[in-house]
Each structure stands twice: as structure tokens, then as C-alpha cells.
């Protein structure tokens, strides 16, 4: 075997090794991502099943995992008649709350209200849930210093209920 053939052979083995290492890394990454998202997906599946048991929900457009004093799973979607509804399911599955979306402020409106009230903060997301027995949007913002803030906005009127700052 000539020197050139030996170099070619080493190069081939190097490429095979590199491909195998990359393949193992990709499979590992996909496995970790799947396992980390599984609790969220399972909560969505269970909340959807409970919501369909208590309502005529046929289509789910959004899912929220909300935790304040208690944990709630909220679904936005449409019923059999095409009405836009929100279904809020407590973690224990009891006392499901059903809201007509038209009777309250939307996620976007809640986020816009917070952005207007706190122009120096960056609005990140909103989640629907229950706080002190009333439906609320929990709007998450960040300050210039990177601190996280939570603003609770009433679903009914879009008014600020509470702000938790600098977490």
C-alpha cells in the first residue's frame, strides 16, 4: 500500500468517524428535545380531553400553561357552532371555566395594553388563567436590565390587576 493510499484510507476513516459522531449528537439532541416537551404535550392532551368532555369544543387554536396561586391549562378554540371560546381547566380537572372570547379582551389586546402602560418594557407573551377566581391574562415582560415582570390583566375589562416586578 502506497503512502497516498494510506492517507486516503485515514481520510475515509476520519470522515466516517465524523459522520457517526454528528449522527449521535443529532439523535441525542432530538431525544432530549422530545423528552423535555413531553410534559407540555401531555398537559395539552389531557386539558383538551377534559374541555371536550364539558364543552362542544371542536378546534383548539392555542394552549396556555398558567401558574399563579394554582396551575391552570387554558385552551382557545371554537365550538360546534363556530363560536370562539376559551376553556380554563384547573390542574385537578375540577370546575372547568368556559368563556366566550368575544366577552373579554384578546391576548393581543392584553399585550397591547401592557405595552402602552409600560413602554420601556418588552412584552414577551401572554397566558390565560384564573387569579382570585377571575379570568386573567398574565402578560410577561422584560425590563432593560433583563429582569422579568408579570402583569395580570382582567379578561373581562382589560384592566391591570397586579404587577410582579423584577424577578
Question: Which stretches of residues belong to each language-model region?
Answer:
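N-terminal membrane topogenic signal
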Residues: 9-11
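N-terminal Lys/Arg-rich, disordered targeting/topogenic segments
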Residues: 1-7
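Hydrophobic membrane-insertion alpha-helices, especially the h-region
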Residues: 13-30
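Acidic/histidine-rich, surface-exposed loop or edge segments in extracytoplasmic proteins
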Residues: 27-30, 89-97
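Conserved histidines in hydrophobic membrane contexts and catalytic metal-binding motifs
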Residues: 51, 66-94, 108-167
Amino acid at each position: 500500500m502506497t503512502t497516498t493510499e494510506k492517507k486516503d484510507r485515514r481520510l475515509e476513516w476520519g470522515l466516517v468517524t465524523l459522520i457517526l459522531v454528528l449522527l449521535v449528537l443529532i439523535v441525542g439532541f432530538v431525544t432530549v428535545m422530545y423528552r423535555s416537551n413531553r410534559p407540555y404535550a401531555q398537559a395539552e392532551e389531557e386539558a383538551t380531553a377534559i374541555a371536550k368532555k364539558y364543552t362542544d369544543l371542536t378546534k383548539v387554536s392555542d394552549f396556555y400553561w398558567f401558574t399563579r396561586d394554582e396551575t391552570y391549562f387554558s385552551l382557545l378554540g371554537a365550538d360546534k357552532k363556530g363560536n370562539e371560546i376559551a376553556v380554563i381547566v384547573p390542574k385537578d380537572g375540577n370546575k372547568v371555566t368556559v368563556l366566550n372570547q368575544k366577552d373579554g379582551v384578546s391576548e393581543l389586546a392584553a399585550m397591547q395594553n401592557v405595552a402602552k402602560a409600560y413602554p420601556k418594557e418588552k412584552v414577551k407573551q401572554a397566558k390565560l388563567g384564573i387569579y382570585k377566581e377571575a379570568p386573567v391574562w398574565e402578560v410577561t415582560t422584560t425590563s432593560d436590565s433583563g429582569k422579568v415582570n408579570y402583569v395580570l390583566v382582567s379578561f373581562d375589562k382589560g384592566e391591570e390587576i397586579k404587577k410582579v416586578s423584577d424577578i
